[in-house]
From Swiss-Prot:
Stabilizes TBP binding to an archaeal box-A promoter. Also responsible for recruiting RNA polymerase II to the pre-initiation complex (DNA-TBP-TFIIB). GO terms for molecular function: DNA-binding transcription factor activity; TBP-class protein binding; zinc ion binding. Signal peptide: none annotated. Sequence repeats lie at residues 111-194, 205-286. Belongs to the TFIIB family. Residues 40-63 are annotated as: Disordered. The keyword Ribonucleoprotein does not apply. It comes from the Archaea. The keyword Zinc-finger applies. This is Transcription initiation factor IIB 1. A zinc finger (TFIIB-type) spans 3-31. One of its GO terms (biological process) is transcription preinitiation complex assembly.
Length: 287
């Protein structure tokens, strides 16, 4: 068994310094250049308030290269000739960073996903999942003949569906740069070819948001949950719009407790027609 403080060549004594371990007898350098885990003392930025650091941004799946690429910075201290030189270098560097049309499309799709995620205030974890889903669809060749915007919106919608975040197709389509048919076509392709773990949406997931939009108290929401459970027991939820079921149960609960909520207001919150809402209301009142 080799002793940690003995030379592996001559079994001599190891002399330790700040930067290396050297054998005192034969001069063999056993280890050198250890990792310095201490702080950085120098700054490489023109900003005097910038914290001295060598590390960049953390790795993220919301960037086409996971954030590993570098950038050529700007400086006001350069002369005109050097400024033009670095402008050319920056242009060539950007071309090298995006070598293919597929990378360019991925950058555009990820940018659209980040915009949609910011619009709905969804967390960065779901953002990374949506970007990963978009990249998987691109790798599988699903984007051929379809719009990038549609798949970006479909990635956000699919991520919301698989994580229990209640966002309807119409809500996503209203904020996206894709039409609703483009979104549904892309989502159907993802669901079919990628095998998304999506199941039926529980109408109860919509109740907190709809109750807040209609300014209804918590007890109305609790009563609406009981009405949803009653519809499920009678088998009247399967095959119906879960958003409309949630709005219908809230409207019914509000009506039974004399809260002033109109059918049109409840339908508008759920983005359904009053006819859809009345169907749920009729099922509950006939029960």
């Amino acid at each position: 068994m080799q002793h940690p403080h003995r030379c592996p060549e001559c079994d001599g004594t190891i002399r330790e310094t700040d930067t290396e371990h050297v054998c005192a007898d034969c001069g063999l350098v056993v280890t050198d250049a250890p990792i310095d885990h201490g702080p950085e003392w120098r700054t490489f930025s023109d900003d005097p308030d910038h914290a001295p650091e060598r590390t960049g941004a953390p790795l993220t799946r919301s960037r086409h290269d996971r954030g590993l690429s570098t950038e050529i910075g700007y400086s006001a201290r350069l002369t005109g000739r050097k400024r033009r030189k670095f402008a050319r270098l920056r242009r060539q560097h950007k071309r090298a960073t995006i070598p293919s049309k597929a990378d360019y499309n991925r950058i555009y799709g990820f940018t659209e996903i980040r915009r949609l995620i910011g619009t709905f205030g969804i967390g960065t974890g779901l953002r990374d999942q949506a970007c990963t889903l978009f990249a998987s669809a691109q790798t599988a060749g699903l984007l051929h003949g379809r719009t990038i915007e549609g798949f970006a919106a479909a990635g956000v919608y699919a991520t919301c569906r698989t994580n229990g975040v209640t966002r309807t197709l119409d809500e996503i389509a209203a904020a996206a740069r894709a039409t609703r048919p483009e979104l549904t076509t892309a989502y159907d392709a993802m669901n079919r070819d990628l095998g998304l773990p999506t199941g039926p949406i529980d109408p109860r997931e919509y109740l907190p948001r709809y109750a807040d939009a209609l300014s209804l108290p918590a007890r109305i929401e609790r009563q609406a949950r009981e009405l949803v459970a009653a519809l499920e027991t009678d088998g009247l939820v399967a095959g119906r719009n879960p958003s409309g079921v949630a709005a219908g149960c809230l409207y019914t609960a509000a009506t039974e407790t004399d809260h002033a909520v109109t059918q049109s207001a409840a339908a508008a919150v759920a983005d359904v027609t009053p006819v859809t809402l009345r169907a749920t209301y009729q099922n509950l009142t006939d029960a």
